């Protein structure tokens, strides 16, 4: 059976039309419903409330503040984060526990918000449409029938929930993230700082962060580019950004006290 999202996407392709914002929002809503039903989403009201408020504080500063944004914490120790079209952003517990300071978490949120603002997943669909790529390839591009499930990717290990972005997509999301977290008053240096932290983690705990590196191509040149964007950022001149806060560490402690994550599902497992 074709997943409803795949059917909807294929209709858009066959119709030869670009994806409108309303269609994007509907695709995201349907995909999020599938993901939320199968991933271990954290329902603790304090955790859920904090991540929603934090994410919204950044999303409200973007050019797509009109979207109905939703932010979630996934109960898995894998270090990763991802976004779905239409304003759905997910951060794994493992990334929150790895972050040393607030600005590293806000940097992550800003980056993922950047993918939505730039409509990267939607552009992949439109590219598939324009080049007349078949439904099977469209499925792999949009990741809505990953691992042969014929439905939204729901890999608890955190290695593949969504289409892997190109290096250009990642650079655009970095730029968008730097601008928008700074507009929200958070230190944009948290973005390259997190990248450096993850590179260090890969040396000592490679399996913990492998999902991040699979989904987010990362090299030293990208870190240097983020540093340069921050140096040239007008908003950074003379501003005192928020680097850390007691509220973040209370949130992090609350996350650490959550029940243990469920058994990890191996990559590619149904």
Task: Describe each region flagged by the PLM.
Residues 1, 17-30, 61-80, 165-270:
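C-terminal capping/extension segments of zinc metalloprotease domains
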Residues 1-15:
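Sec-dependent bacterial lipoprotein signal peptides
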Residues 23-61:
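Post-signal peptide N-terminal segment of mature Sec-exported envelope proteins
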Residues 36-40, 63-97:
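Juxtacatalytic substrate-recognition/specificity segment
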Residues 47, 67, 126-131, 149-153, ...:
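Acidic/histidine metal-binding catalytic segments
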Residues 90-107, 122-125, 163:
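Short pre-active-site segment immediately N-terminal to the catalytic Zn-binding motif
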Residues 103-104, 113-129, 141-142:
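Catalytic Zn2+-binding segment of zinc metalloproteases
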Residues 129-145, 149-161:
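Membrane-active amphipathic alpha-helices enriched in small hydrophobic residues
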């Amino acid at each position: 059976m074709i997943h409803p999202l795949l059917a909807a996407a294929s209709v858009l392709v066959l119709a030869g039309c670009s994806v409108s914002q309303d269609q994007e929002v509907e695709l995201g809503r349907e995909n999020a419903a599938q993901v939320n039903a199968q991933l271990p989403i954290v329902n603790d009201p304090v955790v859920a409330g904090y991540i929603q408020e934090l994410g919204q504080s950044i999303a409200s500063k973007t050019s797509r503040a009109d979207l109905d944004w939703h932010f979630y914490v996934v109960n898995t120790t894998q270090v990763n984060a991802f976004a779905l079209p239409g304003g759905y952003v997910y951060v794994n517990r493992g990334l929150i526990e790895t972050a040393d300071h607030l600005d590293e978490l806000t940097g992550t949120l800003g980056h993922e918000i950047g993918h939505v603002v730039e409509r990267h997943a939607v552009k992949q669909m439109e590219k598939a449409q324009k080049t007349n790529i078949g439904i099977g390839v469209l499925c792999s591009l949009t990741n809505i029938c990953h691992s042969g499930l014929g439905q939204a990717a729901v890999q608890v290990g955190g290695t593949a929930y969504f289409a892997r972005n190109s290096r250009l997509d990642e650079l655009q999301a970095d730029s968008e993230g730097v601008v928008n977290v700074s507009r929200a008053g958070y230190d944009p240096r948290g973005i390259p700082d997190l990248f450096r932290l993850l590179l260090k983690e890969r040396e000592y705990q490679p399996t913990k962060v492998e999902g991040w590196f699979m989904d987010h191509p990362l090299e030293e040149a990208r870190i240097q580019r983020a540093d340069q964007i921050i140096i040239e950022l007008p908003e950074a001149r003379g501003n005192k950004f928020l680097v850390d806060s007691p509220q973040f560490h209370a949130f992090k402690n609350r996350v650490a006290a959550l029940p243990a994550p469920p058994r990890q599902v191996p990559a590619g497992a149904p």
